[in-house]
């Protein structure tokens, strides 16, 4: 398959979405069931949503929630999905809350189709706002943006808030990523019931797909989750809308905001590569003019 050195260039990708309980074993079982369903539908690479082992605890700043973090090495969920990936011959990016000595990260382990752990990506952009208080729990990632060569394709994986930054997508594609994946946890805004970001959310990522001429897969959770905070209860209704976009940004598969789902789409990566080269987007780049992107204030210092 493309990117992995094998024959052929057609790759099937999947996004799954489901409602999370606060019982880890139930969520991991659900993820496995849906991965198996995606495999039956022909998927080679299957994306599960962000932090799927439990409910989205970042609604609150609570010390007890640090107990949910686990080390990368020896992580039982990663080991379980390594076995599953090998059995089904599918690639699985596994999202988890990582403890690394005194640091904590929002991380994804990339599991290849033979069960090999290809490495780790740690979320780079950490949000901090009502209902999404991730800076309390997570250090900014230190891995940098990566492209992982799997059996079926070279892939790039960003995590949730990363998806709002075009620099993240471009950096992964520049390193050879043929498909972009974004595990996500996004829904209503506790401070403003009238704010609905789902269409904006989709359009931003559709832009990444179109600007880089690569397919893109986003997996989001569904369901209403209430967490006890230091100020009372906080509730988010996660809006699902997991989707798969084609290389011009067109949505080819879309889930709704309420139902568990498994989306699968096939892409010919050789054909997409030829189109990408033909457009000249990467030929005509001017990195010498982009130094301003390395600043916070736009000054050319």
From Swiss-Prot:
Which residue positions are annotated as catalytic? 50, 123, 160
Instruction: Note the InterPro entries from the entry.
Output: Aliph_Amidase/BUP, C-N_Hydrolase, C-N_Hydrolase_sf, N-carbamoylputrescine_amidase
Reaction catalysed by this chain?
A: N-carbamoylputrescine + H2O + 2 H(+) = putrescine + NH4(+) + CO2
Q: What UniProt keywords apply to this chain's record, in alphabetical order?
A: Hydrolase, Polyamine biosynthesis
The EC number(s) attached to this protein equal 3.5.1.53
Pathway(s) the chain acts in = Amine and polyamine biosynthesis; putrescine biosynthesis via agmatine pathway; putrescine from N-carbamoylputrescine (amidase route): step 1/1
**NCBIfam families in the record, alphabetically?**
agmatine_aguB
What is this protein's name? Answer: N-carbamoylputrescine amidase
* Organism for this UniProt entry: Oryza sativa subsp. japonica
Tell me the name of the encoding gene.
CPA
